[in-house]
Amino acid sequence: MPTINQLIRKPRQPVAARNKVPAMEACPQKRGVCTRVYTTTPKKPNSALRKVARVRLTNGFEVTSYIPGEGHNLQEHSVVMIRGGRVKDLPGVRYHIIRGTLDTQGVKDRRQRRSKYGAKRPK
Protein backbone atom coordinates (compact mmCIF):
# COMPACT_ATOMS: atom_id res chain seq x y z
CA MET A 1 0.00 0.00 0.00
CA PRO A 2 1.62 3.32 -1.04
CA THR A 3 1.82 6.29 1.30
CA ILE A 4 0.04 9.58 0.56
CA ASN A 5 3.39 11.12 -0.33
CA GLN A 6 4.21 8.35 -2.81
CA LEU A 7 0.80 8.85 -4.45
CA ILE A 8 1.44 12.60 -4.75
CA ARG A 9 4.80 11.93 -6.43
CA LYS A 10 3.45 9.26 -8.75
CA PRO A 11 -0.38 9.07 -9.03
CA ARG A 12 -2.22 5.85 -9.82
CA GLN A 13 -2.33 4.90 -13.50
CA PRO A 14 -5.73 3.83 -14.87
CA VAL A 15 -5.77 0.36 -16.40
CA ALA A 16 -6.01 0.84 -20.17
CA ALA A 17 -8.77 -1.27 -21.75
CA ARG A 18 -7.34 -3.77 -24.22
CA ASN A 19 -8.69 -3.60 -27.78
CA LYS A 20 -10.58 -6.77 -28.74
CA VAL A 21 -10.33 -6.15 -32.50
CA PRO A 22 -6.98 -4.43 -33.14
CA ALA A 23 -6.91 -5.13 -36.89
CA MET A 24 -10.07 -3.07 -37.47
CA GLU A 25 -8.33 0.20 -36.48
CA ALA A 26 -11.66 1.69 -35.29
CA CYS A 27 -13.42 0.92 -38.60
CA PRO A 28 -16.76 -0.93 -38.73
CA GLN A 29 -15.62 -3.18 -41.61
CA LYS A 30 -12.38 -3.92 -43.45
CA ARG A 31 -11.67 -5.43 -46.87
CA GLY A 32 -9.15 -8.20 -47.37
CA VAL A 33 -8.02 -11.11 -49.53
CA CYS A 34 -8.28 -14.74 -48.43
CA THR A 35 -4.86 -16.35 -48.19
CA ARG A 36 -6.12 -19.71 -46.92
CA VAL A 37 -9.59 -21.25 -46.50
CA TYR A 38 -9.81 -24.26 -44.21
CA THR A 39 -11.77 -25.99 -41.43
CA THR A 40 -10.81 -26.26 -37.80
CA THR A 41 -12.21 -27.97 -34.72
CA PRO A 42 -13.69 -26.09 -31.75
CA LYS A 43 -12.45 -26.48 -28.19
CA LYS A 44 -14.12 -28.76 -25.66
CA PRO A 45 -16.94 -29.61 -25.11
CA ASN A 46 -18.03 -28.81 -28.68
CA SER A 47 -17.36 -30.86 -31.78
CA ALA A 48 -17.64 -29.75 -35.42
CA LEU A 49 -15.66 -28.65 -38.47
CA ARG A 50 -15.84 -24.86 -38.39
CA LYS A 51 -15.13 -23.02 -41.64
CA VAL A 52 -12.51 -20.28 -41.26
CA ALA A 53 -10.31 -18.20 -43.56
CA ARG A 54 -6.98 -16.50 -43.11
CA VAL A 55 -7.42 -12.96 -44.50
CA ARG A 56 -4.77 -10.36 -45.43
CA LEU A 57 -6.38 -6.96 -44.83
CA THR A 58 -5.82 -3.72 -46.72
CA ASN A 59 -3.96 -2.31 -43.71
CA GLY A 60 -1.43 -5.17 -43.77
CA PHE A 61 -2.85 -7.21 -40.87
CA GLU A 62 -3.35 -10.94 -41.40
CA VAL A 63 -6.26 -12.29 -39.34
CA THR A 64 -8.28 -15.48 -38.96
CA SER A 65 -11.98 -14.90 -39.59
CA TYR A 66 -15.04 -17.11 -39.36
CA ILE A 67 -17.29 -17.92 -42.33
CA PRO A 68 -20.87 -18.03 -40.95
CA GLY A 69 -23.80 -19.96 -42.43
CA GLU A 70 -24.15 -23.28 -44.22
CA GLY A 71 -21.96 -23.64 -47.31
CA HIS A 72 -19.76 -20.97 -48.89
CA ASN A 73 -17.99 -20.16 -52.17
CA LEU A 74 -14.74 -18.77 -50.78
CA GLN A 75 -11.32 -19.87 -51.95
CA GLU A 76 -7.83 -18.44 -52.02
CA HIS A 77 -7.68 -14.89 -53.52
CA SER A 78 -11.39 -14.24 -52.82
CA VAL A 79 -11.94 -10.60 -51.80
CA VAL A 80 -13.97 -10.44 -48.58
CA MET A 81 -15.29 -7.91 -46.09
CA ILE A 82 -14.77 -8.63 -42.39
CA ARG A 83 -16.37 -7.27 -39.23
CA GLY A 84 -15.45 -7.67 -35.59
CA GLY A 85 -16.98 -10.40 -33.45
CA ARG A 86 -15.28 -13.43 -31.99
CA VAL A 87 -16.28 -17.09 -32.11
CA LYS A 88 -16.35 -18.31 -28.53
CA ASP A 89 -15.28 -21.90 -29.19
CA LEU A 90 -12.51 -21.11 -31.71
CA PRO A 91 -9.43 -19.67 -30.00
CA GLY A 92 -7.83 -16.86 -32.00
CA VAL A 93 -10.82 -16.22 -34.27
CA ARG A 94 -11.89 -12.62 -33.51
CA TYR A 95 -13.50 -11.60 -36.79
CA HIS A 96 -16.44 -12.61 -39.00
CA ILE A 97 -16.67 -12.53 -42.78
CA ILE A 98 -19.75 -10.62 -43.99
CA ARG A 99 -21.92 -12.78 -46.26
CA GLY A 100 -23.39 -11.27 -49.44
CA THR A 101 -20.68 -8.63 -50.02
CA LEU A 102 -17.80 -8.55 -52.55
CA ASP A 103 -16.85 -12.14 -53.52
CA THR A 104 -18.82 -13.78 -50.69
CA GLN A 105 -22.24 -15.10 -51.72
CA GLY A 106 -25.20 -15.12 -49.35
CA VAL A 107 -26.49 -18.35 -47.84
CA LYS A 108 -28.76 -20.30 -50.19
CA ASP A 109 -32.35 -21.09 -49.11
CA ARG A 110 -32.07 -19.00 -45.94
CA ARG A 111 -35.53 -17.95 -44.70
CA GLN A 112 -34.98 -16.52 -41.22
CA ARG A 113 -32.40 -13.89 -40.14
CA ARG A 114 -31.67 -13.36 -43.83
CA SER A 115 -30.00 -9.98 -43.43
CA LYS A 116 -27.29 -11.52 -41.27
CA TYR A 117 -26.42 -13.97 -44.05
CA GLY A 118 -26.84 -11.81 -47.17
CA ALA A 119 -29.82 -13.82 -48.45
CA LYS A 120 -32.46 -12.28 -50.70
CA ARG A 121 -36.15 -12.52 -49.82
CA PRO A 122 -37.63 -15.75 -51.22
CA LYS A 123 -40.36 -15.33 -53.84
UniProtKB/Swiss-Prot annotation:
Compositional bias segments (type: Basic residues): 110-123
| One Gene Ontology term from the biological process aspect of the record | translation
An example Gene Ontology cellular component term from the record? Answer: small ribosomal subunit
Q: Which residues carry this modification: 3-methylthioaspartic acid?
A: 89
Q: GO molecular-function annotation terms?
A: rRNA binding; structural constituent of ribosome; tRNA binding
Q: What SUPFAM superfamilies does the annotation carry?
A: Nucleic acid-binding proteins (SSF50249)
Keywords for this protein: Methylation, Ribonucleoprotein, Ribosomal protein, RNA-binding, rRNA-binding, tRNA-binding
Q: Which Gene3D superfamilies match?
A: Nucleic acid-binding proteins
Disordered: where is this region? 101-123
Please tell me whether the keyword Ribonucleoprotein is annotated for this protein. yes
* Coiled-coil stretches: none
Q: Show the NCBIfam families listed in the entry.
A: rpsL_bact
Q: Indicate the quaternary assembly.
A: Part of the 30S ribosomal subunit. Contacts proteins S8 and S17. May interact with IF1 in the 30S initiation complex.
Q: What does this protein do?
A: With S4 and S5 plays an important role in translational accuracy.
Which family is annotated? Belongs to the universal ribosomal protein uS12 family.
Protein name as it appears in the record: Small ribosomal subunit protein uS12
Upper lineage: Bacteria, Pseudomonadati, Pseudomonadota, Alphaproteobacteria, Rhodospirillales
